[in-house]
């Protein structure tokens, strides 16, 4: 019967992988000293009477390490896109050039870099908590299965060990992603 429970573990592993992926998406929105199109992924624009993501009304490119270009397809939303970028908490000031926005990426101050590292740490900690909650859910489900005599006590212990290994792997991925992002942020 243990083989019937194996998919349960893969389901929890998938959830943990999604938590790590979510962290990487959060990190993409954190500004570093270099330009990245991912920096603008979270920006929502008030266009056509509703809030839409920036990439649905424009194409984003990075021609230089310290500049982002936004090519807006409809002239009518240029001011809305500019306003959305300016009002974001990224501290960017776009320059309008017809249908294009040129966004210079100013170098970060040492203080701002340290703040960004703290924010990245908070993101990472939130995902670690999410991973641990998934582990708790998995262990609870395994204990319920053991109580219902679906799996034996030995299988329970074996599967709990496997869940812990999966959890350790996910936590390690979070730590590695955080370390990489910290290095990226602190790089001058």
Curated annotation (Swiss-Prot):
Q: SUPFAM superfamilies, alphabetically? A: Ribosome recycling factor, RRF
Q: Which GO terms describe its molecular function?
A: ribosomal large subunit binding
A GO cellular component annotation here is: cytosol
Compartment(s) of residence: Cytoplasm
**Major localization listed first in the record, in broad terms:** cytoplasm
Pfam families recorded for this chain?
Answer: RRF (PF01765)
**What species was this sequence derived from?**
Caulobacter sp. (strain K31)
Q: What does this protein do?
A: Responsible for the release of ribosomes from messenger RNA at the termination of protein biosynthesis. May increase the efficiency of translation by recycling ribosomes from one round of translation to another.
Q: Which domain of life is it from?
A: Bacteria
| Xref: PANTHER family | MITOCHONDRIAL RIBOSOME RECYCLING FACTOR PSEUDO 1, RIBOSOME RECYCLING FACTOR
The record, for InterPro entries, names: Ribosome_recyc_fac, Ribosome_recyc_fac_dom, RRF_sf
Q: Which family does it belong to?
A: Belongs to the RRF family.
Q: What are the alphabetically sorted keywords of the record?
A: Cytoplasm, Protein biosynthesis
UniProt name for this protein: Ribosome-recycling factor
Q: Which NCBIfam families match?
A: frr
């Amino acid at each position: 019967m243990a083989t019937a429970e194996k998919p349960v573990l893969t389901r929890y592993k998938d959830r943990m992988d999604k938590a790590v992926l979510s962290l990487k998406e959060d990190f993409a929105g954190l500004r570093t000293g270099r330009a990245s199109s991912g920096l603008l992924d979270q920006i929502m624009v008030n266009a056509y009477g509703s809030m839409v993501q920036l990439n649905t009304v424009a194409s984003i490119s990075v021609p230089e390490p310290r500049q982002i270009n936004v090519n807006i397809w409809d002239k009518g939303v240029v001011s809305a896109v500019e306003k959305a970028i300016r009002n974001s908490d990224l501290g960017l000031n776009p320059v309008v050039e017809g249908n294009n926005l040129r966004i210079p990426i100013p170098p970060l101050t040492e203080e701002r870099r340290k703040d960004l590292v703290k924010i990245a740490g908070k993101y990472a900690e939130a995902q670690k908590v999410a991973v641990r909650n998934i582990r708790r859910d998995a262990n609870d489900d395994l204990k319920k299965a053991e109580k219902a005599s679906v799996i034996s006590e030995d299988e329970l212990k074996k599967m709990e060990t496997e869940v812990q290994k999966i959890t350790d792997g996910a936590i390690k991925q979070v730590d590695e992603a955080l370390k990489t992002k910290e290095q990226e942020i602190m790089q001058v």
